[in-house]
Amino acid sequence: MAQETFSDRLRQAMSDRDVRQSDVIRASEMLGKKLGKSQMSQYVSGKTIPRRDVAELLARILEVDVTWLLAGDADQGEASSPRNDSKPEPHPSAQIARSTTMRTFSKSTKLDNVLYDVRGPVVDEAARMEDEGERILKLNIGNPAPFGFRTPDEVIKDMRQQLPDCEGYSNSRGLFSARKAIMQYSQIKGLPNVQMEHIYTGNGVSELIQLSMNALLDNGDEILIPSPDYPLWTACATLAGGHPVHYLCDEQADWYPDLEDMESKITSATKALVIINPNNPTGSVYPREVLEGIVEVARRHQLMIFADEIYDRLCMDGYEHVSIASLAPDLPCVTFSGLSKSHMIAGYRIGWMVLSGNQRCMSDFIMGINMLSNMRLCSNVPAQSIVQTALGGHQSVNDYVRPGGRVYEQRNFVYEALSKIDGISVVKPRAAFYIFPKMDVKKFNITDDEQFALDLLHEKKILITRGGGFNWAEPDHFRIVYLPRMEVLKESLEDLADFFDHYRQS
């Protein structure tokens, strides 16, 4: 008979008392302690064995002997988990387990297939470790401000001056000044047939992605999304009732979309396709000929195009960003951009959505967009007030992405350092803040990329995002953000090289 493990005894104790993971977490809070969902899940699944103090907390909650819980009890055999009857005081878990008067509330089944690992279980574990005093280097999210990137002074000054006038709601689409500046910027980018009434500001691009998916997709409608993707696209399409279908981007071709794979996945249920250009997580910038090929696919199959272009002002190495909408005047196109990345103001939450091209064929979709836009009243007005200033005049982001600039030099360093690690291969990113290296899964014996991310976190205190978090099917990639200062990146890449020098997943 297989030897009983800690997780076996933990599950047995929970089953004997009709206690679930959420009950244990609540009971720990009543005792003034903190157990994270990811932390508890790992104990139950057997991925992690807790430290003695955490085991004592679990034993107290479940009213069992901690020695039995940690190491087993030969006298117990297959008997029920032994209670610790020495405690005279009432116990929080007993109240939880005995309560049958209140029904339980589960999350909506609409969330069953929603994935967003950029802030997921590994991040929860990192938060738990931070709560215990560990210092974690966060290479998992493109948030410039914590790494010393500052908002342009002129933008801050402008917001301060306009703040007294930003106390009320704006037009649901956005301030006139903001939409006018966005329209002019869109015209410079070559977007055809752009009108003020078809420009919408949002609390970041994220809100507008969700809004547009809800406006377009009926249950079962298919939408083509790249793999790897920014996972919010897949999550929002799923939440809206749609069916995301992932087309491959080819690592051997600088991560450009595989047009044959894209077209092979189109069915009668396909309504639209998404491109992310410049791409997150790969940093790829699509050339005009690739974009023209995508337009031809959309044209042949009468698809709407959604273009996530939030990183369009962060191109390097002479690469020029071309907006796909500028190549498709006859097709319905929705283009997303904003200031979070280019102006280092992710916390301000200001993005926009521009509808261009053939607007007659999407008139009903536009009615849906207007309805949902009205329902949320408006995006935050103080952030809208600085769009005109931010898009005009000197663009400080250019100083970051040219040779000698901080983003440019840090990108180069991380690319070269990763290229030197045995078992790691990587395509050089041409834009944005991210790099998406590939691991030799045979060399490192990797079958579970989430476990790899946890192992790296526990050993080196480095937080990355696994490739699976970007809807990449194989467990062989991960994403690194190269925003930390150079001295921090040097230390972290040394740690990463040391980790891969000996790592073999068990």
Predicted ranges, named:
Residues 1-28:
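A short, Lys/Arg-rich alpha-helix, primarily the initiator
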Residues 30-50:
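Recognition helix of helix-turn-helix/homeodomain-like DNA-binding domains
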Residues 45-60, 76:
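Short, basic-rich loop-to-helix N-cap that marks the start of a DNA-contacting helix
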Residues 61, 188, 264, 445-447, ...:
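PLP-dependent enzyme catalytic core of the Aspartate aminotransferase-like
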Residues 103-204, 211, 378, 390-394, ...:
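N-terminal small-domain helix-loop-helix segment of the aminotransferase-like
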Residues 329-405, 415-417, 500:
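Conserved core segment of the aminotransferase class I/II
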Residues 388, 404-415, 426-440, 474:
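Conserved glycine-rich beta-strand-loop-beta hairpin in the small C-terminal domain of fold type I
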